[in-house]
Regions:
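Bacterial N-terminal signal peptides
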Residues: 6-16
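Sec/Tat signal peptide C-region and signal peptidase I cleavage site
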Residues: 17-21
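Signal peptide-directed extracytoplasmic domains
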Residues: 64-126, 131-135
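N-terminal segment of the mature soluble domain
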Residues: 44-66, 118-181, 194, 275-301, ...
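Short, surface-exposed ligand-recognition loops at beta-strand->loop->(often short) alpha-helix junctions
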Residues: 144, 262-271, 304-305
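Extracytoplasmic
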Residues: 188-189, 305-328
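A short, hydrophobic beta-strand-centered structural micro-motif
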Residues: 73-82, 123, 163-170, 177-211, ...
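Amphipathic beta-strand/beta-sheet edge segments enriched in Tyr/Trp
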Residues: 22-34, 100, 189-237, 331-339
Length: 339
């Protein structure tokens, strides 16, 4: 009863017109290229396996083994499927029922990542030694190797459920990147200019006839032939994402942490609705209750499925919340609502 009274008071404080929130991204949809499955049943099974990788942030087979041990029927979670043509390639597009799947994954201890996904900004420099180095951008590329690298990044982003983005350079950017100034850091400049939750600076350099070297945040330990370059980047980016997305499960018998979440920056009832909607999307939160509220701020007591790190990883990709401060002594996380 007290909780209901608090909510009613809060609604009166934040009176405003009701508005609809934005649609959620296609978290429970998976697309499998036609050359990666033999028949529809095989495609549906592979789509489910890819969904588990997407939801857990992990490529570990142990989560699939748990599903097998629990004797969950993968096909039962399929809501719909169809084939579609993307570019010149046909895909099996599968949509899964998240409402029925998520509780089952919780039961078998699968760590999950919600709808908020990180943006990884990539500054990618290619130096062939024949002309001035070039930086890959989000625009189309006529060079075959550059086009293959960009397609590989696009496929990985789709598979892992993250955003792997290349900058869109304006004329000022191009002039700065092409200047020969040892005091200018292209990496620092691009990282500060464009939004990102994580940043990779990569340099691909030709060091001989059909020999390439990779430097920067991703490094090759030996020269690569051109035909090996794409496979190297696929493996290296996947390994980077393994570390970035990993949600460590609790020790057997351990309980999830409790965290006070304080959200400031609310202006009206529409903001309150948006906050509630955004919190509903966060898989790290098991339950929440109102602790205190003011006109522009709400405090929630949250019970997590895992540790606060899992919550922080989800919030890192949020477009609605900005992490301001975490106080370990009071176990309080302060967020700014971005409206």
């Amino acid at each position: 009863m007290i909780q209901k009274i608090k909510i009613l008071i809060l609604l009166n404080v934040l009176m405003a017109n009701i508005a609809f929130t934005k649609e959620l991204p296609a978290l429970f949809e998976v697309k499998i290229p036609e050359d990666q499955y033999t028949n529809t049943n095989d495609g549906l099974n592979k789509a489910f396996n890819q969904l588990i990788q997407k939801l857990s942030g992990s490529r570990s087979k142990k989560f699939l083994w748990r599903i097998g041990d629990a004797q969950l029927n993968k096909i039962e979670f399929v809501s719909s499927y169809s084939t579609e043509l993307i570019g010149e390639q046909e895909f099996l597009s599968v949509r899964f029922n998240g409402e029925s799947l998520i509780p089952e994954l919780r039961k078998i201890g699968t760590p999950l990542i919600g709808f908020n996904r990180p943006v990884i900004l990539i500054l990618f420099k290619i130096d062939t030694g024949e002309s001035a180095p070039v930086y890959l951008s989000s625009s189309s590329s006529s060079d075959q190797l550059a086009a293959e690298i960009k397609q590989a990044l696009k496929n990985i982003a789709l598979e892992r459920g993250v955003y792997l983005e290349l900058p869109e350079f304006d004329l000022e950017d191009q002039n700065l990147l092409n200047q020969a100034n040892i005091l200018f850091s292209p990496s620092n400049y691009i990282e500060e200019k464009f939004y990102n939750d994580a940043f990779l600076a990569i340099e691909l350099v030709r060091i001989g006839i059909n020999q390439w070297s990779v430097n920067g945040d991703l490094k090759s330990i030996s020269p690569l032939q051109e035909k090996q370059v794409i496979e190297f980047f696929k493996n290296a980016v996947h390994e980077f994402l393994d570390d970035l997305l990993e949600v460590k499960p609790l020790e057997p018998g351990a309980l999830g942490e409790r965290v006070m979440v304080s959200i400031q920056g609310l202006k009206n009832f529409q903001d309150f609705q948006s906050v509630e909607s955004e919190l509903d999307k966060i898989f790290a939160i098991k339950s929440r209750s109102f602790h205190a509220f003011e006109r522009t701020k709400i405090d929630y007591m949250t019970q997590l499925f895992q540790t606060k790190d899992s919550l922080m990883k989800e919030l890192r990709g949020s477009t609605k919340f900005l992490i301001k401060e975490y106080n370990a002594d009071t176990n309080q996380l302060k967020l700014e609502y971005l409206n």
